[in-house]
Curated annotation (Swiss-Prot):
Miscellaneous comment: PubMed:18984160 shows that peptidoglycan fragments serve as a novel mechanism of interspecies bacterial signaling that likely indicates the presence of growing bacteria and thus serve as a signal for dormant cells that growth-promoting conditions exist.
TM annotation in the entry: 331-351
Protein's UniProt name: Serine/threonine-protein kinase PrkC
Effect of mutating T162A: 4-fold reduction in activity. Abolished activity
The gene coding this protein: prkC
Domain PASTA positions: 356-424, 425-492, 493-559
């Protein structure tokens, strides 16, 4: 039991999240980097099987050499106590197979969005000379945001490798297997392209194109049967999209896309207006194709040689007898004429069936597939017209035969030509474009076309409330009005935005938040002793208020504390006179440190012969201090620090 086990002292296994024939996948915690990872562990049954170990390691080596947003990242590879493991990126979501089961068939636009990511990943692998060889929805992950990750390169092979496995022991899944793999050929880049076409078919229809009771029967269908039309199960599929499937799944690799990049380019342009109604993709048969030459047996050669000898001998004999026969020829000619006349009379009167074709009743082939219907007609001795005509029918499924011309049970002569009519299904109507209309207008327009199964999905959008912003199927799609459903996506207007509390936001952060939510900033400024300069002081409407995109929000930003003026302080200073000898002059220096003076400079200098009083003026800034000192004969006699005066 691996749950709870710590591998390599680093990966704590939490629970099982998946598994396959070769390995199980667990959710684990990387305790060093504090993140969730997926860890694939080779089954214990194969821990001693060198081939499986080699294939397991190849998966890590193949994927780790690739760097693409749609390929699962490989973090680590190792072995501990016969536990072989690969540590990889954890994708929180589900497999594409599970997604199709839950949501299929998908809308063509969603299907192509998914396929574009998958094909981009495979194109990157091909550029690095790696063929995946097991492309299927089970090996593709999709997260909750619709992002795709291709995984499971367990049987991927480098094209330059000398260990490419031939498919006589077929690896991969038979439902997605290319014809060349099914017949035992090499898996190439074009084999991956074939599998991509099958995946696109499954996305659009919710089903696989070929199924059967055994792997062999399915493989035979890949070899022999044409890929069915996706439109049969999803009429909303444009021809440009179906053509991608048909080209990718061509039986001969020569007729497929040359590269995955070519397929990706077609996917990106499939909904361009000039492509939506393009002609169906078909493969032109080469008129100069080599025809089979029947084998001539030895006996036939001998017979032909004998006949030639007989001709030569007869010619020689005839030459000898020629003169004798000339006399008998009128009697011979008369005898031959009598024989032919007698035979003609007998043929017309006694044996008419020898010259007249027999009567045949045309069988009823309605509801049959073309091959079965044509076979039945030919069995009755009838010729089948090469051109099959199409006709709508309310009861017979699309693609099956409806009727013949002449009609069933009509008696005709053997060898007569019969024309087949194939059902296109129930009569279809091309749905109009109702986007941009109000929901009531759209419903009326659709009802006028006969569409009664209309559902509405309401979403927030910038368009006015009640406006149709999307329709599914898209305009121009042919549908059966009495059966097919039309889904309208209708705007209920922009979603309300609940304002955040913008306090402590800088001007840049506040304006960015409002812009991201489509709100207009009305900027104001005010002094604040509490809020640092440049930050939000207040907002209007208040935090928690619901507003619509486009509304104005008034935001007041702090200018910081309001600046006070510098103040002048007057100080009276008494200077003592204390000479060593009476009558000596004393040198006085006054220094001031304030807004206008530096303590290193002399504010005032003079001489005294008696005690003196002076008034000093100091200019002090708010929050600052003033200072003065008095020196007599270079000796400090007084000094003082003065605070900024408080307001009265």
């Amino acid at each position: 039991m691996l749950i709870g086990k710590r591998i390599s002292g680093r990966y704590q296994i939490l629970r099982v999240i998946g598994g396959g024939g070769m390995a199980n996948v667990y959710l684990a915690e990387d305790i060093i980097l504090d993140r969730e990872v997926a860890i694939k562990i080779l089954r214990f049954d194969y821990a001693n099987d060198n081939e499986f170990i080699r294939r397991f390691r190849r998966e890590a080596q193949s994927a780790s050499s690739l760097d693409h947003p749609n390929i699962v990242s490989i973090y680590d590879l190792g072995e501990e106590d016969d536990i072989y493991y690969i540590v990889m990126e954890y994708v929180e979501g589900m497999t594409l197979k599970e997604y199709i089961t839950a949501n299929g068939p998908l809308h063509p636009k969603e299907a192509l969005n998914i396929m574009e990511q998958i094909v981009s990943a495979i194109a990157h692998a091909h550029q690095n000379q790696i063929v995946h060889r097991d492309i299927k929805p089970h090996n593709i992950l999709i997260d909750h945001m619709g992002n795709i990750k291709v995984t499971d390169f367990g049987i991927a092979t480098a094209l330059s490798s000398t260990t490419i496995t031939h498919t006589n022991s077929v690896l991969g899944s038979v439902h997605y297997l290319s014809p060349e793999q099914a017949r035992g050929g090499l898996a190439t880049k074009k084999s991956d392209i074939y599998a991509l076409g099958i995946v696109l078919f499954e996305l659009l229809t919710g089903r696989i194109p070929f199924d059967g009771e055994s792997a062999v029967s399915i493989a035979l269908k890949h070899l022999q049967a044409e890929t069915p039309s996706a439109k049969r199960w999803n009429p909303s599929v444009p021809q440009s999209v179906e053509n991608i499937i048909l080209k990718a799944t061509a039986k001969d690799p020569f007729h497929r896309y040359e590269t995955a990049e070519d397929m990706e380019a077609d996917i990106k342009t499939a909904f361009d207006a000039d492509r939506l109604n393009e002609k169906r993709f078909t493969i032109q048969e080469d008129e100069e194709m080599t025809k089979a030459i029947p084998i001539i047996k030895d006996e036939e050669l001998a017979k032909a040689a004998g006949e030639k000898e007989a001709e030569v001998t007869t010619a020689q004999e005839n030459k000898t007898k020629k003169n004798g026969k000339r006399k008998k020829w009128p009697w011979v000619l008369l005898t031959i004429c009598l024989v032919f006349i007698t035979a003609g009379i007998l043929a017309v009167t006694v044996f008419p069936s020898l010259f007249m074709p027999k009567d045949v009743k045309i069988p009823d082939v309605s509801g049959m597939e073309y091959e079965k219907a044509a076979g039945l007609l030919e069995k009755e001795g009838l010729q089948v017209d090469s051109e099959v005509l199409e006709i709508s029918d309310e009861k017979i499924e699309e693609g099956l035969m409806v009727k013949t011309d002449p009609k069933a049970d009509t008696t005709v002569k053997e060898g007569a030509t019969v024309t087949l009519y194939k059902s296109t299904g129930k009569a279809k109507t091309e749905i109009g474009d109702v986007t941009g209309q109000t929901v009531d207008q759209a419903k009326k327009a659709l009802k006028d076309q006969g569409f009664n199964h209309v559902t509405v999905n309401e979403v927030n959008d910038e368009k006015n409330a009640g406006t149709v912003i999307d329709q599914n199927p898209s305009a121009g799609t042919e549908l059966v009005p009495s059966e097919d459903q039309v889904k309208l996506t209708v705007s209920i207007g922009p979603e309300d935005i609940t304002l955040r509390d913008l306090k402590t936001y800088s001007k840049e952060a506040a304006s960015g938040y409002l812009e991201d939510n489509g709100l207009k900033l009305v900027e104001k400024e005010a002094y604040s002793d509490d809020v640092p300069e440049g930050q939000v002081v207040k907002q209007k409407p208040a935090a928690g208020t619901a507003v619509k995109p486009g509304n104005e929000v008034e935001v007041t930003f702090s200018l910081g504390p309001e600046k006070k003026p510098a103040k002048t302080v007057k100080e009276k200073v008494k200077i003592p006179y204390e000479p060593e000898n009476e009558g000596d002059e004393l040198q006085v220096q006054i220094a001031v440190d304030d807004a206008d003076h530096s303590i290193s400079d002399t504010y005032e200098e003079f001489k005294i012969k008696e005690p003196t009083e002076r008034t000093i003026e100091l200019k002090i800034e708010p929050g600052q201090k003033g200072y003065y000192q008095v020196m007599v004969n270079n000796k400090v006699v007084s000094y003082k620090t003065i605070e900024y005066p408080k307001d009265e």
